[in-house]
Each structure stands twice: as structure tokens, then as C-alpha cells.
């Protein structure tokens, strides 16, 4: 499971590096949809079945509509791919090398083990016992997101705002 999660995380980051290298809107939308599917697979791999399904339906449904309009507005006769510019290809390769270096650095200093073992989850456990519980981890995760991850919510909101700005700029053709 650890290697599957690590592989999905690397694919997710490489997909976002591929999207941020500003290819044609057709290819950018495809990479963003594939990265969204991989992100949902990460959530499913961590045990969040309901959350993974909701992210899949809401995020990918919205992105399909946005990129459908973007592709219709910014249609090109010869769309620009990642290999058409040397600087774009170098940017993708540098991003990939940085990701591999980060994984190797985290593995060398036992940072990867600390992240993937989940040793400090004692404060998240609400129901312990032999019987069946009525509280699922998905609903606990939403509460923990707003309790422990206040800045994560702020960064997520800012990222969504920047994403909307990028989509508008791509649709205008700049």
C-alpha cells in the first residue's frame, strides 16, 4: 500500500507539473482530469471511499464543464504540445528531477517513514471498542480539516482562486 500511495503521489505531482508548463488548453485539460482521477485514487487508497467519490463527481464534473468551454473558446489549428518548446520540456524535466530528489531526500532522513506510518493519530480516534461504531473516518476528516488544517483551508481557497484566474487567462488566449 505504501508503494502504491507513493507511486500515485509521484504521478499526481508529475501531472500537475505537466499542466503548469502551459501546453495547449486541450492537453492541459486532459492532464488536469487525469491528475484529478489520480488524486481521487489517492483518497480511495487512504480509506476515504465517500470523500473520493464526492471529489471525483464534483471536481471532475466542474472541470469537464470549464475545460469544455475553454477548449471551445481557445481552439487552435495546431495545438502546442509539451515538446514544441525547449524551455517547456526543460521545465517538465526539472520538475520531475526535483520530485525524485525530494523523495530520495525524505527516504534518507526517515521523513518518508514518519509521514506514511501515521504514528500521531491518537487525537483523531473517537470511538474505540469491540462493538460497531456509528462515526466514520470521512466525517471525522472534515472536522479535522477545519480544526488542525486551518492554513490548509486558506491555501486551498487561494489555490482555487489562482486556478480560476489561470483558466480565464487561458480562455482569453494570453
UniProtKB/Swiss-Prot annotation:
GO terms of biological process kind: mitochondrial electron transport, NADH to ubiquinone; mitochondrial respiratory chain complex I assembly
Topology with respect to the bilayer: Multi-pass membrane protein
Name this polypeptide is given: NADH-ubiquinone oxidoreductase chain 6
Domain of life of the organism encoding this protein: Eukaryota
Species in which this protein is naturally found: Hylobates lar (Lar gibbon)
UniProt GO MF annotations: NADH dehydrogenase (ubiquinone) activity
E.C. code: 7.1.1.2
InterPro entries, alphabetized: ComplexI_Subunit6 (IPR050269), NADH_UbQ/plastoQ_OxRdtase_su6 (IPR001457), Nuo/plastoQ_OxRdtase_6_NuoJ (IPR042106)
